[in-house]
Amino acid sequence: MELDHLFLCVGDRGRCGDLLAEFGLREGSGNRHEGQGTANRRFFFRNLMLEILWVEDEEEARSPLTAPMGLWERCGGEEGRSPFGIGLRVQDPEEVLPFPIWEFCPPYLGGRGCIRVGCGAGTEEPLVFCIPAGAGPYGERNASQPKAEVAGAGWVREVELRSKQGVPLSGPLEAVNGLAGFRAFRGDEDLLTLRLGPGPGTRRRCFAPALPLELRW
């Protein structure tokens, strides 16, 4: 089990992604998620994809199929709703995850399996899920996507995820906290920090409040 991608839910139909492009991050292709009601903009680092996610179809996002994901609430900017999602990947499709799950099988996966979603967490904390083996942004279909980098640094060395949630971390989030280079904790703001490059750097760029994202290199 390892990190595959991180999403940030936004309410402006992805326009805040322009901030990343204007900063100089190369952008990959976007997707429309049939049956899920969302669309995205994607930025591919060498080992991790950053996804700007928004709701395009309210009816699909609030349907009985998709509503349990909480994407409508997360992208609506409501106080107390976490905008973050943590996507995991596995090499072995039979690998048992270290937390209880339920299966989300949207049409856009085309029968290539289901997304395994962590149980026990509400929308006040990041959504933890595992994509089907081989179906994520680092599968063969996306091998030629342009890679994002900052000052030549394209490898995400550390991820810090700060959340304003007022509840203890759930089992799925605690399990992800055990991964090397990842740390989730409670704080006074929602903020995702990506540390790039081989060692500690002194430079930073914060895109808040438009986007709860900070890059350090």
Residue ranges, per PLM feature:
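A cross-family detector of function-defining hotspots
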Residues: 42
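Residues that cap or flank secondary-structure elements
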Residues: 7-8, 31
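Glyoxalase I/VOC metalloenzyme domain signal
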Residues: 1-3, 9-26, 45-217
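Conserved catalytic-core motifs of GNAT/GCN5-like acyltransferases
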Residues: 28-34
